[in-house]
């Protein structure tokens, strides 16, 4: 009896995977060298610049805000202790459920993503550390077809390097300050102020879930954001329902607050650049 033929699609995938694995092995030393001098957390935080400059009177009180960076809207760096724990938990649940356990790469999630890709349903498996590496290094920015094999390898190497030099708290803090949330809003300070008129420490559970849901697709349509928010709320066993999240999202995404007004608000001093 003749053996059953191997499906062409499976064989093609196996061949591509073997080639990618070979490239990964050959390029690993280069990727490691490229990220040996990755910046310290203190350097990244010190280099952070708000997109708004605040003019003060002779008594040190804010008078006027001028935008100095037209590419993004970004407020002052927000320490992790000033970010609502409910938001931190929602982001970890949405983006990296084993954040506290892995060393930069979640191999379990990566294996699951590979299986789904073979089945024709691709999904991401990037950890918060990997995403942060992509935000810190312009060379890791994905192209129109996503990241190349070499970029993915370098991203893995960079994430592992970050985990060796930074604490988990520093990784989470930097990610929340650098990640794009919606349109030109970058970082949790601008996102909380621009969408909800709040400081990050004042976010409630519904707002936290909505912001976490935005991270996977900052410019996704409102109905997509609502669906992701509903799924995340169910995952977290949250006290808020889908109808509430849908209404909250529609309102926040349609009517964005004026960041200049937020920065000048006397009850929001933590948003002023140091």
Question: Locations of the language-model features?
Answer:
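Coil-to-alpha-helix initiation sites in intrinsically disordered, low-complexity, charged segments
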Residues: 11-12, 148
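N-terminal post-signal-peptidase region of extra-cytosolic proteins
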Residues: 38-41, 71-80, 94, 156-157
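Flexible, acidic/glycine-enriched loop-and-adjacent beta/alpha segments
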Residues: 47, 79-131, 186-191, 196, ...
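Solvent-exposed coil/turn segments that connect beta secondary-structure elements
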Residues: 49, 58-61, 68, 83-86, ...
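N-terminal periplasmic "start-of-domain" segments of outer-membrane beta-barrel proteins
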Residues: 61-74, 108-115, 151-152
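Non-catalytic, structured segments within soluble enzyme domains
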Residues: 125-274
């Amino acid at each position: 009896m003749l053996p059953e033929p191997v499906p062409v699609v499976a064989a093609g995938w196996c061949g591509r995977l073997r080639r990618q694995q070979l490239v990964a092995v050959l390029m690993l030393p280069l990727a490691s060298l490229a990220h040996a001098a990755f910046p310290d957390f203190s350097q990244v935080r010190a280099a952070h610049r708000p997109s708004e400059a605040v003019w003060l009177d002779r008594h040190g009180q804010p008078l006027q805000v001028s935008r100095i960076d037209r590419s993004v809207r970004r407020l002052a760096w927000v320490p992790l202790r000033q970010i609502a724990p409910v938001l931190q938990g929602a982001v970890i649940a949405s983006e990296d459920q084993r954040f506290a356990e892995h060393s930069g790469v979640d191999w379990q999630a990566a294996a699951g993503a590979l299986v789904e890709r073979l089945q024709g349903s691709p999904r991401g498996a990037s950890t918060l550390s990997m995403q942060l590496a992509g935000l810190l290094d312009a060379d890791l920015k994905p192209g129109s077809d996503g990241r190349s094999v070499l970029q993915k390898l370098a991203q893995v190497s960079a994430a592992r390097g970050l985990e060796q030099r930074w604490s988990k708290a520093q990784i989470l803090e930097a990610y929340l300050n650098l990640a794009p949330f919606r349109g030109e809003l970058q970082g949790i300070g601008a996102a909380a102020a621009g969408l909800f008129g709040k400081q990050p420490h004042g976010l409630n559970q519904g707002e936290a879930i909505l912001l976490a849901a935005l991270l996977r697709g900052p410019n996704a349509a409102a109905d997509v954001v609502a669906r992701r928010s509903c799924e995340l709320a169910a995952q977290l066993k949250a006290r808020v329902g889908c109808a509430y999240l849908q209404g909250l999202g529609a309102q926040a995404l349609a009517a964005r607050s004026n960041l200049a007004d937020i920065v000048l608000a006397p009850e929001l001093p933590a948003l002023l650049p140091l």
